[in-house]
A protein has these predicted regions:
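A conditional alpha-helix N-cap/helix-loop micro-motif detector
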Residues: 32, 100-104, 131
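Membrane-anchoring hydrophobic helices of lipid-metabolizing enzymes
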Residues: 1-67, 84-85, 175, 198, ...
Length: 209
């Protein structure tokens, strides 16, 4: 009996604490934004996009979203429900699924939503990793919806490791940056395995698909 009570208490309290912590960190550190002009141009034209960032950088990302009506892919595992409730406080909605649980259904739902005219948010390496190695889902999603992939990265001069998923970066007393990378170009040929660089915010493609 005690365990269910603690679980309910966790789901009730942690999202509010998480939301407040992210907001506080956002106000207390100097976060600058780089490379957002193409994103703002897309938004000004009423166009939608797929925002992609590494799983370990997810903690501060709700503060980076510049549009409205985004759906975020969140795992059904472990802390997924907590993340779902935290991002809901930022006005973001979620689709639940991962490569090991509900992935096919989640991909279908994301395709449907992307075609209906909303932004999509995905971590292409996922909670299970391998870290900073993009899986095929983001490429399949872009090809099926016609939406451009917009790479996003977060970096800070000092950071602690916070257990929000797999080691999210949690800045403390630091200078930080949200950096948007150039959109990768996808050909119409059957995609091979995407080979993204691990190097920070650039997300350069090193092989064609």
């Amino acid at each position: 009996m005690l365990k269910p009570l603690l679980s309910r208490a966790k789901l009730s309290c942690v999202p509010a604490i998480g939301y407040g912590t992210i907001r506080l960190l956002g106000h207390s550190i100097g976060i600058r934004v780089e490379g957002a002009q193409p994103v703002d141009a897309l938004l000004a034209q009423g166009k939608r996009m797929i925002i992609a960032f590494w799983h370990a950088q997810q903690l501060m990302m709700p503060l980076a979203y510049r549009g409205s009506g985004a759906y975020v892919l969140i795992s059904r595992h472990g802390d997924g429900e907590l993340i779902h409730r935290i991002i809901a406080r930022f006005g973001l909605q979620s689709v639940r699924g991962s490569s090991t649980r509900g992935g096919t259904e989640a991909l279908r739902e994301l395709i449907r939503l992307g075609r209906s005219g909303v932004d999509l948010v995905i971590t292409p390496d996922g909670p299970k990793g391998p870290r900073q190695v993009a899986k095929m889902g983001v490429v399949q999603l872009a090809k099926a919806t016609g939406l451009p992939i917009v790479p996003l990265a977060f970096g800070c001069s000092k950071k602690n490791s916070s257990r929000a998923g797999t080691g999210s970066s949690c800045p403390t007393r630091s200078r930080a940056v949200f950096s948007y990378g150039a959109r990768p170009s996808l050909s119409r040929r059957r995609p091979g395995h995407p080979n993204w660089s691990r190097n920070g915010s650039s997300w350069r493609r090193r092989s064609t698909v």
